[in-house]
Design a protein with these regions (language model features):
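Structural core segment of the AMP-binding/adenylate-forming
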Residues: 73-74, 101-197, 514
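Conserved ATP/PPi-binding loop(s) of AMP-dependent carboxylate-activating enzymes
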Residues: 388-392, 403-436, 474
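AMP-binding/adenylate-forming catalytic core of the ANL superfamily
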Residues: 113, 120, 130-132, 419, ...
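Conserved AMP-binding/adenylation subdomain of ANL enzymes
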Residues: 240-259, 267-308, 322-323
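AMP-dependent adenylate-forming
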Residues: 7-13, 18, 33-56, 74
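Gly/Ser/Thr-rich phosphate-binding loop
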Residues: 306-311, 320-381, 394, 404
Length: 567
């Protein structure tokens, strides 16, 4: 074992693209400071585009101030947690920055979560206020009294559509009714607080106290390295630092001229940082999509061609196929950054042939706001690796059994990360915080890596037993507990199996109770009522028993080996 950190010399700096600094400046502004600077500098420029409707930075700033005042009238004060349960839409962006302007804390949620999943998170963070898509209003309204927020604001995202599209949705025809049902719903409550009423008042008084860089900005729920969902605490300084690191990483960005495509969900740390903070810090136009759809992207590209597209490999593959078929022109895309799951070299080749631009892989985790490493934007990038540490970011590679001990150069070990983007711990989880956040500010990644002599990092294994599917983390334990609730299931183990495109699927091995029989489709339907769709096992195998250790723990690696033999 090494006696000290072999990576202190930062040999990877030689691989940085020209103009990329080794360090970023000290963070001195909060996220509200950042967006206000963009409003001042790029006031007339487009900030958001949604189904063709464009919002300028000046109008965005005005809406943020009015929404902040509306939230203040509802009783939101600094330090309050405010839950957001919204798809990608302009109201999501406004709500995010309005909450932060008051010094309150944003808590992001997946609007496609089941009531059970949402309730678990609300029980943990105890938000007094929620701003929710009107289609999930009733879910939150039905929470037990001790969990339900005091105030729930209903958002009809179709109010942000252009006039012509709103009119089309009101047509008394089946197609319009079906489209409307997917996008909006009327809450059962007689007089819910509407988003429109929240933003129709005056602007927030300038004297209203402002948050500081060290204040908590966000609770972002993650399975972490242990599989149990918990809120990662991220400050204004953490999130602003990561936006600054992203800006420094990409040479040739044109302030006020780039067009980012928001195909990633803003409730995910990756989509949030790339499109809500990084993009808006440079005055970019952010084209928002409530869900990824090739035809929607194709239509938008005809009016506002994308120049910067953060996404995940399955999205790049779908768009590359569409380009090859002639249904979309991607040649405007200069920069594409992939994350959240491994990036196959074949995906890179197809994408770069379709666009003429670069597709590079980055690496991070919710606990690092989320980006910590990336491939250089230039000839020194290396497909198949996750690149090198970002500016102001340090790494260690340690013995996973004793993270105080560094491994020898080139040997595999657990990746540790330190930098201004590293989180502050988990909400109300001191034990798990201490396990993940080590002395000196190092965060454990749970990933086993090797580091090449020139500093490029390759992931070779995963300590944490999370499954990454479509860019989302799935806790095997959560899925196993759901399966075990079925009356015919005696035991279950959940693992990842490989997909042909290099990604992973959720697979389950189940042991039935004596005399029981079960239809796999029925079991998956059972899960679908309790879990978000991406967590539902794609493959289910009925087995006689599960391999266990001497102390009775299921050996998931052995389960995976068995299933690979049967798949």
């Amino acid at each position: 074992m090494a006696t000290s950190n072999p990576h202190e010399s930062k040999v990877w700096l030689a691989a940085y693209a020209p103009g990329v600094p080794s360090e970023i400046d000290e963070v001195v502004e909060t996220l509200p400071d950042m967006i206000e600077a963009s409003v001042k500098t790029h006031g007339k420029a487009p900030a958001l585009e949604f189904f063709g409707a464009v919002t300028s930075y000046r109008d965005l700033g005005d809406q943020i101030e009015r929404a902040a005042e509306g939230l203040c009238r509802l009783g939101v004060v600094a330090g309050d947690r405010v839950a957001l349960i919204l798809p990608n839409c302009p109201q999501h962006v406004v709500a995010f920055y309005a909450v932060l302007r008051l010094g309150a804390i944003v808590v992001e949620h997946n609007p496609l979560y089941t009531p059970r999943e949402l309730r678990h998170q609300f029980e943990d963070h105890e938000a007094r206020f929620a701003i929710v898509w009107d289609k999930v209003y009733d879910v939150v309204d039905d929470f037990p009294q001790d969990v339900r927020p005091e105030q729930i604001v209903a958002v009809d995202m179709t109010e942000a559509f252009p006039w012509s599209k709103r009119v089309a949705l009101r047509l008394p025809v089946a197609k319009a009714r079906a489209a409307r049902a997917k996008l909006t719903a009327k809450p059962r409550a007689k007089h819910p607080v509407s988003w429109a009423s929240l933003v129709e008042g005056r602007r927030l008084p300038r004297r209203t106290p402002r948050p500081s860089v060290d204040d908590i900005a966000l609770l972002q729920y993650t399975s972490g390295t242990t599989g149990s969902p918990k809120g990662a605490i991220l400050t204004h300084g953490n999130l602003r630092a990561n936006a600054m690191q992203g800006r420094a990483w990409v040479p040739g960005l044109r302030e006020g001229e780039e067009t980012f495509y928001g195909v990633l969900p803003l409730f995910h740390a990756y989509g949030m940082t790339l499109c809500l903070t990084f993009a808006m810090s440079i005055g970019a136009r952010v084209v928002l999509f409530p869900t990824f759809d090739v035809s929607l992207v194709s239509d938008a590209a005809k009016k506002s061609p994308p120049t910067f597209l953060p996404a995940v490999p399955p999205i790049y593959d779908q768009l590359s196929r569409a380009s090859a078929q002639g249904s979309i022109d991607l040649t405007s895309v200069r920069f594409a950054i992939s994350g959240a799951m491994s990036l196959p070299v074949a995906t890179v080749e197809r994408w770069e042939e379709a666009t003429g631009g670069l597709l590079v892989e980055g690496y991070g985790m919710t606990e690092t706001s989320p980006v910590a490493l990336g491939n250089p934007i230039g000839p020194s990038r290396r497909p198949g690796t996750v690149g090198v540490p970002f500016p102001s970011t340090e790494i260690r590679v340690v013995d996973p059994e004793d993270p105080s001990v560094d491994v020898e150069p080139g040997e595999p070990g657990e990746l540790l990360i330190r930098g201004p983007q590293v989180f502050q711990g988990y909400w109300r989880r001191p034990g798990e915080s201490a396990d993940s956040l080590l002395e000196g500010g190092w965060v454990r990644s749970g990933d086993i890596v090797t580091v090449a002599p020139d500093g490029f990092v390759t992931i070779v294994d995963r300590l944490k037993e999370l499954i990454i599917t479509g860019g989302f983390n799935v806790s095997p334990t959560e899925v196993e507990e759901t399966l075990q609730q079925h009356p015919d299931v005696a035991d279950a183990a959940v693992v990842a199996l490989p997909r042909r495109d290099g990604g992973e699927i959720v697979a389950a091995a189940v042991v039935l109770r004596p005399g029981a029989t079960i239809d796999v489709t029925t079991l998956r339907d059972f899960c679908r009522t309790r879990l978000a769709a991406y967590k539902v096992p794609k493959r289910v195998f009925v087995v006689e028993d599960l391999p266990r250790s001497l102390i009775g723990k299921v050996l998931r690696r052995e389960v995976r080996t068995r299933l690979l033999g049967e798949a």
